[in-house]
Curated annotation (Swiss-Prot):
Gene3D superfamilies: 2.30.30.1190, 2.30.30.140. Residues 497-513 have a biased composition (Basic and acidic residues). A zinc finger (C3H1-type) spans 176-202. This is Zinc finger CCCH-type with G patch domain-containing protein. Keywords: Acetylation, DNA-binding, Metal-binding, Nucleus, Phosphoprotein, Repressor, Transcription, Transcription regulation, Zinc, Zinc-finger. Residues 90-131, 267-296, 367-394, 492-513 are annotated as: Disordered. It comes from the Eukaryota. The lineage of its organism: Eukaryota, Metazoa, Chordata, Craniata, Vertebrata. One of its GO terms (cellular component) is nucleus. GO terms for biological process: negative regulation of DNA-templated transcription; negative regulation of epidermal growth factor-activated receptor activity; negative regulation of transcription by RNA polymerase II.
Length: 513
């Protein structure tokens, strides 16, 4: 509704309220008086809501009128701001030089002190003149994103690099760390640097931009925005409805409910999508707040010998797909200038149980050996395996093992194991054989259970189809006969594996001392 409709409705409600009040003073029945009092309360509440809507519409019109006058002032504000800050930051050199040329016995300490006091007074006056001025200041988030927020200057300070700077407080805080501390503004904050709220941020003068009033004319249903909540923070949201200066917004966070706000509690998003026009391309080319677009032929892709995302063959990672969605091109380095490393970081497996110093010595020895070209001969798996090697010493346990196996020393059978195996190797072989037998026995038992379940299912199907379908019954009987035959074979296989397992256990007990 526009302003005229609201004013007409307000006059109508006032006239109705006067009629109700006259009726109440006429002395009617108690039952009618109760209805009239309820109607009187409803009319008063309706008048209050209409007046609030009228105030909101007038406020929106006033903001729109101010937005039309702002562009003419914005052109002169940046230059005036730069000049004002430069004047406060500069130290007058000429008067000091003149005072130094005059002999000290003639001038005395009085003029010098007065000059310093005047300089301090000028600095304080300049800082006081800048305090309260609104600007557009940069803010680097915790994850490295550069954003420009509307802020207010609270004083002049020197930046970290020595350049002139100002301390600013952000007007539309999106995080708790940006929300101004109310006690700091009063000079009563006890936490100082440990305060979880903002005490201002020192920004270089060169990074400041002119203050930008929020443009609400571009906001409509479906537009992204920032909406203010009761905690004083601005959260990302999306407009679902616009009605007479009131905006119904739905927050991006699922924990926040849909709400209705006025025009002073809503903002366009701080980071908008680029329009893609040629004018903006030229102005943003040298802006440090935008990432530089690297042309395909401009950047040196480097040499990448390793297969990109080759490690994902062995994992379930989605790193390569995420990088591709974020605009990464194969062969280029990471970073906005594509200057990062190209080769992936190779994993180095260090010896187990060694200190870092010992690992460093081992790596140095390997490096020196590789540079000198020294190649060590491969180690033999067992002594005496080659021709002319010395036979291993024999013990009582080797003699017992040979006797229990039925073999004669010095006359091995064809296809038998070489006589050079010690008792420890025989023990390891029997252990691996026992593990393989246990695995085969477990698989056979699982197959037996599956076959038994299949037989039970076929028998149930035969019971259901008995005397109904002769063809189906014949097929089921054939399946049942085949399943029973397979079950018999599996049981025979299970018995054979159990015999081999018992034989291995007996062999282990007889050969292990």
């Amino acid at each position: 509704m526009d302003e005229e409709s609201l004013q007409t409705a307000l006059r109508t409600y006032d006239a109705q309220l006067q009629q109700v009040e006259l009726a109440l003073g006429a002395g009617l029945d108690p039952s009618e008086l109760a209805d009239l009092r309820q109607l009187q309360g409803d009319l008063k509440e309706l008048i209050e809501l209409t007046e609030a809507s009228l105030v909101s519409v007038r406020k929106s019109k006033l903001l729109a009128a101010l937005d039309g006058e702002r562009p003419a002032q914005e052109d002169a504000e940046p230059l005036a701001l730069q000049n004002a800050i430069a004047e406060t930051a500069e130290v007058p050199v000429a008067p000091g030089a003149e005072l130094e040329t005059v002999p000290s016995r003639e001038t005395g300490p009085g003029p010098t002190e007065r000059g310093q006091e005047e300089d301090d007074g000028e600095d304080e006056e300049g800082g006081a003149a800048l305090s309260g001025r609104k600007v557009n200041a940069p803010y680097y988030s915790a994850w490295g994103t550069l954003e420009y927020h509307n802020a207010m200057i609270v004083g002049t300070e020197e930046a970290d690099d020595g350049s002139p700077g100002v301390r600013v407080l952000y007007l539309y805080p999106t995080h708790k760390s940006l929300k101004p501390c109310s006690f700091f503004l009063e000079g009563k904050c006890r936490f100082q640097e440990n305060c979880r709220f903002s005490h201002g941020q020192v920004v270089s003068v060169d990074e400041l931009r002119p203050f930008q009033d929020p443009d609400l004319s571009s906001l409509q249903a479906g537009s992204a925005c920032l909406a203010k909540r009761q905690d004083g923070l601005w959260y990302p949201a999306r407009i679902t409805d616009v009605d007479s200066g009131y905006y119904t917004v739905k927050f991006d966070s699922l924990l926040l409910k849909e709400t209705v706000v006025e025009g002073d509690s809503i903002l366009p998003p701080l980071r908008t999508e680029p329009a893609g026009s040629s004018d903006s391309d030229g102005s943003d080319a040298d802006d440090p707040s935008y990432a530089r677009v690297v042309e395909p032929g401009a950047a040196n892709p480097g040499t990448c010998s390793s297969a990109f995302a080759g490690w994902e063959v062995h994992t379930r990672g989605i790193g390569s797909r995420l990088l591709a969605k974020m605009g990464y091109e194969f062969g280029k380095g990471l970073g906005r200038h594509a200057e990062g490393r190209v080769e992936p970081v190779h994993a180095v497996v260090l010896p187990r149980g060694k200190s870092l110093d010992q690992c460093a010595e081992i790596l140095q020895k390997r490096t020196r050996a590789g540079q000198a070209g020294v190649s060590k001969p491969p180690k033999c798996r067992s002594r005496g395996s080659g021709p002319g090697g010395r036979p291993p010493p024999r013990s009582v346990f080797d003699f017992l093992n040979e006797k229990l196996k039925g073999g004669a020393p010095g006359a091995p059978e064809v296809g038998a194991a070489p006589p050079g195996r010690s008792g420890k190797e025989v023990y390891h072989a029997s252990r691996s054989t026992k593990r393989a037998l246990s695995l085969r026995l477990l698989q056979t038992e699982e197959k037996i259970e599956q076959t038994q379940r299949a037989i039970r299912g076929i028998q149930e199907a035969l019971a259901r189809n008995a005397g109904r379908h002769s063809v189906t019954t014949a097929q089921l009987q054939e399946k049942l006969a085949g399943a029973q035959q397979q079950l018999g074979q599996l049981r025979a296989q299970e018995a054979g594996l159990q015999r081999e397992q018992r034989k291995a256990d007996t062999h282990k007990k007889m050969t292990e001392f």
